[in-house]
A protein has these predicted regions:
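Tubulin/FtsZ superfamily GTPase core signature
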Residues: 1-377
């Protein structure tokens, strides 16, 4: 009689172990995103995305209290419990050392929550924090490993970062300024080398000026909803047809793959009959209402502009099509001749004409980043 060893694989049931999609994306966007919120600031940002239907979300933190305060399912929270209840404080090295030991567990959590149907991963963080700034590099590495695992190539172009810069008040702390300067510099280098795409910069000091009367309670919620909301508009409209001009999903994907920094903005158009109204609004948008500033727009490699208005506006405003075309041409000129992808959409709920702008492939805003050095002691 032959003595054949029993193998564990004999008990493997392919039907039973087939990976299930544990969380379904509900954003309705052209691309399926998985969102990772690193640290307190990143967790808040991830929660804003989660509320807009980006349900493939994981929050990662070294402090249990920060995770407890996030209203997302507990199984979508990952505690790097290396430093007790208080987490890493502002110590990024501490957080980095802690998450490196948990790399495999983080990867397993990605597999569990994200499943296999993901087009891109977006990692959100505040660059000055311990948890966010300290864990981001390991999270980027794990995100790329995850894409390789599910059989997707060009992984560098599929992992993006949303990084927020601290307010001037926060930067008055030398530790905050040092963390922010070092981490943002490093992320910009990764983006410019095409190792991540895109790097979306959010300048909390700039946004504070856009919303000068915000209460403390509403400040972070408003900022994060603005960021996630703007991002969501482009993803959703790229999934919708228009009887005027459709913003194509392939064009949207190509913009998201550009190496370098990306900025977003929105503004409404006044005096619609004026032939320069749309171009003036776009110019104002690029100069005033973007979520970060200090960029040389002529370094852009890609841009998108979407105009949204009601049926009444499109039907009754004489010469509006020419004005919109002139606006698109203005954006192309301001961005150094970058390819501008266009969209014109009707929305019954809009009683005004609104322009949404996305500019990608930008070189870093050196002056803003270097400005953090003045706070260093």
């Amino acid at each position: 009689m032959v003595d054949i060893p029993t193998l564990d694989i004999e008990d493997y049931d392919p039907d039973l172990n087939e990976e299930k999609e544990t969380v379904e994306d509900q954003s309705g966007g052209a691309l399926t995103y998985a969102i990772v919120g690193a640290g307190q600031g990143g967790g808040r940002m991830a929660k804003a995305f989660f509320d807009m239907g980006y349900t493939k979300t994981i929050a990662v933190n070294t402090a249990r209290s920060d995770l407890n305060g996030l209203d997302i399912p507990d199984e979508q929270k990952f505690l790097v419990d290396e430093h007790g209840e208080q987490g890493a404080g502002k110590d990024q090295d501490k957080a980095q050392a802690a998450i490196e030991k948990k790399e495999q567990e983080v990867f397993n959590k990605f597999r569990e929550i994200f499943g296999t149907n993901v087009d891109r991963i977006l990692i959100c963080l505040g660059v000055s924090g311990g948890s966010g700034g300290g864990t981001v590099n390991t999270l980027i590495k794990v995100a790329k490993k995850y894409f390789t695992y599910i059989g997707i190539e060009d992984v560098d172009e599929r992992v993006g970062v949303v990084a927020s810069l601290p307010t001037a008040g926060e930067s008055a702390s030398p530790t905050v300024a040092k963390n922010a300067h070092a981490r943002m510099t490093q992320l910009c280098t990764l983006a410019e080398k095409g190792k991540i795409a895109p790097l979306i910069m959010v300048d909390n000091e700039k946004i504070k000026k856009l919303y000068p009367k915000l209460t403390v309670k509403k400040f972070w919620t408003t900022i994060n909803n603005t960021v996630a909301g703007l991002f969501h508009v482009f993803n959703v409209l790229a999934n919708k047809d228009s009887e005027y001009t459709t913003f194509d999903a392939t064009d949207y994907d190509s913009i998201m793959r550009q190496p370098g920094c990306m900025i977003m903005g929105v503004t409404s158009v006044k005096n619609l009959e004026n032939e320069t109204a749309v171009s003036s609004a776009l110019k104002k948008n690029l100069e005033k209402t973007l979520l970060a500033e200090g960029f040389d727009l002529t370094t852009a490699t890609g841009a998108a502009c979407i105009v949204v208005g009601s049926e009444e506006i499109f039907e009754e405003t004489a010469g509006l099509m020419d004005n919109i075309e002139f606006g698109f041409d203005t954006l192309a000129a301001l961005t150094g001749g970058a390819m501008v992808h266009r969209g014109i959409y009707e929305d019954a709920n809009k009683d005004k004409l609104v322009t949404y702008t996305l500019v990608s492939g930008l070189k870093r805003p050196s002056k803003r980043i270097e400005g953090l050095k003045k706070f260093l002691k």
